[in-house]
Amino acid sequence: MQSIKQLLYGLAIFVTLFAVCPVQAAIVVGGEDGWTFSTDGNVNLFMRYTTADDRPDNVHSAFYTLSDDEESFRMRSGFLPGVLAFNVKSPTMAGLDMGARVGFYPNPQNANTKNSFNTQIDLREIFFTVDGNFGQFLVGKALSLFQGQNALTGMTLFGFGIEGSVSGGGATLGNIGYGYIYPQFNAQVRYTTPEFHGFKLAVAAYDPSQIVGSGVNMAGTVVEPAATETKTPRWEAELSYAGLYADGDGNVKSWLSGLHQTADFTDGGDVTAWGVAGGVLVGYKGYELVASGFSGEGLGSTLMLDSDSLDYTGEEREGYGYLLQGTYTFANRFGNTKLGIAYGANRMDETSAEKAVRDAIGNGELKQQDVITVGVYHDLNPNLKLVAEYNLANVEWFNGGDQEVDIISVGTFFMW
């Protein structure tokens, strides 16, 4: 009880310090018996200008990632929203190290309106961990394993990438739908093994998701079949490796992840979503190359599982994607500068039902989304970052329709 009182007292001190010293980089408050309380986060804002071609007629996507015939300027967050996270860590007790994290992810912009009273605050993280010589258990809401590293190793993590909705109040998409599918933050129970010669294995059971589709039928009507009955958890796993070479001048990171989940329709029948993903990162001095990709069935094109994972008949759609990236980071008198170029693409296969509709009425379902990104990411110091990006995106549909969008963005981060 005394430790809890000290922790609450420390929290009160922290709030006071944070209110009067908002630019202090790292604040850690300690209590009695080894308890600690800390915070980390960022505030970011981007200015961006977008020009978009007309969206073709007679095409369908469950989630349109590009604007339609529009020139637009906005000020908004980048791929990362703002972050304000709180961390609590206990002293070691009986060989166990325990901690918890709660992360709030707000966005600075309204939904393209002057007045807004529901600006998005995304509670992405709320979990605790228990570490010991057996490895680690994580319980709560955190980034999912499947394709998690694909997203975290992309250079648009601290950039802008694809915008999604021009009038949106949330964060941008980065390379979501254009190199990987969004792994999302989900409720889970995860076990991670101790490191063994650079290798780790993580296995997790997740709160399952309904598996949803979207497509145009023979009558030209959009149908959205949904398998909503979930009787077992979703399972995800990741095998990863991290190591150094060339006397520490080089680093290597690789990963392989997988997903499996089933769901039933209320009127009978079931669907199965599965996928594999992986990648490798190789760095040497300031140079870094990343190649990652995924393949699966019933996953969707952009948002995983609950958007366009099925065609209009309820059949699982197959798809794959990849991201290729090269960066060079160098020190200069103004700080550290990273120059990068990347190409990412997601592609969906056409089901027999979708082809039949295309032959009959000409409708085209989503075929491919790809983007070329060129970026400059400059750290003035460890807490202040400047970013400039250019993204050239293209979407194709199976009936031959296509659309192109240019996105120019500049932004800044303050991080602690």
Q: What residue ranges belong to the model's regions?
A:
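Detector for outer-membrane/organellar transmembrane beta-barrel domains
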Residues: 237-374
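Outer-membrane beta-barrel architecture
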Residues: 85-87, 126-129, 190-192, 238-240, ...
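Transmembrane beta-barrel strands of outer-membrane/channel proteins
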Residues: 41-49, 100-104, 141, 203-205, ...
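Outer membrane beta-barrel
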Residues: 27-49, 71-211, 241-244
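Outer-membrane beta-barrel translocator domains and adjoining extracellular loop/strand segments
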Residues: 52-63, 110-123, 152-155, 209-231, ...
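Outer-membrane beta-barrel strand-turn architecture
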Residues: 31, 90-92, 131-134, 193-197, ...
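Residue-level detector of the transmembrane beta-barrel scaffold of outer-membrane proteins
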Residues: 36-42, 97-99, 136-140, 149, ...
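Outer-membrane beta-barrel "beta-signal"
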Residues: 196, 237, 378, 404-416
